[in-house]
Amino acid sequence: MFTVFLLVVLATTVVSFTSDRASDGRKDAASGLIALTIKGCCSYPPCFATNSDYCG
């Protein structure tokens, strides 16, 4: 019974680890899209005036 418990814990850990690594790529893509959107906003004066704290 203890062996089954260890196998379940190991399987859960492996699935969780690989799922987290897969989602990291999606997070990177989303942050890149947000950065491009903010850069576009910084070059547009009305948007820059409203969101100047995001523009470097």
UniProtKB/Swiss-Prot annotation:
Keyword terms, alphabetized: Acetylcholine receptor inhibiting toxin, Amidation, Disulfide bond, Ion channel impairing toxin, Neurotoxin, Postsynaptic neurotoxin, Secreted, Signal, Toxin
Modified residues (Cysteine amide): C55
Signal peptide bounds: 1-16
The keyword Signal belongs to this UniProt entry's keyword annotation: yes
Maturation propeptide residues: 17-39
Cystine connections: C41-C47, C42-C55
One cellular component term from this protein's GO annotations in UniProt: extracellular region
Subcellular location field: Secreted
Gene Ontology terms, MF aspect: acetylcholine receptor inhibitor activity; ion channel regulator activity; toxin activity
Region of interest (Ser-Xaa-Pro motif, crucial for potent interaction with nAChR), residue spans: 43-45
Tissue specificity of this protein: Expressed by the venom duct.
InterPro entries (alphabetical): Conotoxin_a-typ (IPR009958), Conotoxin_a-typ_CS (IPR018072)
Keyword Disulfide bond: yes
Family, per entry: Belongs to the conotoxin A superfamily.
Entry function: Alpha-conotoxins act on postsynaptic membranes, they bind to the nicotinic acetylcholine receptors (nAChR) and thus inhibit them. This toxin blocks mammalian nAChR alpha-3/beta-4 subunits.
Record remark on domains: The cysteine framework is I (CC-C-C). Alpha4/7 pattern.
Protein name (database record): Alpha-conotoxin AuIA
